Amino acid sequence: MATPPLVPLLLLLLLLLPHAHHRLALRSVLATQRAQDSPAVHLINGLGQEPIQVLTFDLTRLVKASSSFELRTWDSEGVIFYGDTSPKDDWFMLGLRDGRPEIQMHNPWAQLTVGAGPRLDDGSWHQVHVKIRGDSVLLEVDGKEVLRLSQVSGTLHDKPQPVMKLAVGGLLFPPSSLRLPLVPALDGCLRRGSWLDPQAQISASAHASRRSCDVELQPGIFFPPGTHAEFSLQDIPQPQTEPWAFSLDLELKPSEGSGRLLALGTPEDPNWLSLHLQDQKVVLSSGMEPGLDLPLAWGLPLQLKLGVSTAVLSQGSKKQALGLPPSGLGPLLNLWAQPQGRLFLGALPGEDSSASFCLDGLWAQGQKLDMDKALNRSQDIWTHSCPSSPGNGTDTSH
């Protein structure tokens, strides 16, 4: 026998409730159903570190003091949600650090930073529930209580300011104002969000994400067409000195289009050494000199190794060596001695490029680079996930 739909069954049961509870229960059921039916949303809106949603609540009308949602991410650090009645004196933040949940609180009763629970950055959906009971805060992950903080809060009805703002996917003050700062942007998807009490909600504003959670995702770093990032050469592992050598390793997944993959240079002259994607090949060039190309084999690491007089591009058993002109070698080595030396990834600012590509990883001198620590980058870069097909990354539907 087919199982009856959840909402009609619950509505039927509501008819048996006393009239005094009828309207409250009906609103609760409908709010729960809306949360379950709503599609997953991406926690980064492409506008920087701003929240994807800000809700305002009247605490004097609050009946339900809990929030719940499901989260999927490969990102180990960022803000899930933040709430305050005063950004200076009374605020709360739930985020991830090293993949595990972290709560930060600052109010007249408690000032604390606590991490607890399992890692959530495994790419699976995890159910998270935050409850306020009297003066305590409870955190549940996948149905298990992982943290209970007692004597850390007054009741919500006793707050000096009766209005609370709740921000999803960001903060309402600078990250430096956190007790222990972290990178706010969290590359992840959230669904079935239920935030405090819908009956007490006064207003809501949203910034639609330009990323889709409907496409099949996998871990990695995704560069949509025209996006870029740059690292200062002084902030990444340094070349070997005797003899001089520097290497970059990329695990490149199937890509689309043509355009720049990476470059070494300065903001004024970024073309000292460049790698371009072109017709399923990579083309290595130095300055205005003719380049060489290497057909790509997906699934094998691509390595660029710089020596005293050559730049060697290799993948598996295939290898191409580009001789560096004597006049060009000195400036290339000097890149590491000046503060303007840069490693550029993706298109240069203002450069026309149709290339979209995903990196499974990027290593300098054998050490993995963290895109969250780039000197600057396009906000549309997916720092910890990739669509299974590069063409799906520009889908803005949810």
Curated annotation (Swiss-Prot):
The gene is SHBG. Pfam families: Laminin_G_1 (PF00054). Residues 1-31 form the signal peptide. InterPro entries: ConA-like_dom_sf (IPR013320), GAS-SHBG-PROS (IPR051145), Laminin_G (IPR001791). GO terms for molecular function: steroid binding. Glycans are attached at N376, N392. Transmembrane segments: none annotated. Functions as an androgen transport protein, but may also be involved in receptor mediated processes. Each dimer binds one molecule of steroid. Specific for 5-alpha-dihydrotestosterone, testosterone, and 17-beta-estradiol. Regulates the plasma metabolic clearance rate of steroid hormones by controlling their plasma concentration. Disulfide bonds join C189-C213, C358-C386. Homodimer. CDD domains: LamG (cd00110). It is found in: Secreted. GO terms for cellular component: extracellular region. This is Sex hormone-binding globulin. Residues 41-213, 220-386 form the Laminin G-like domain. Keywords: Disulfide bond, Glycoprotein, Lipid-binding, Repeat, Secreted, Signal, Steroid-binding. PROSITE patterns: LAM_G_DOMAIN. It comes from Oryctolagus cuniculus.
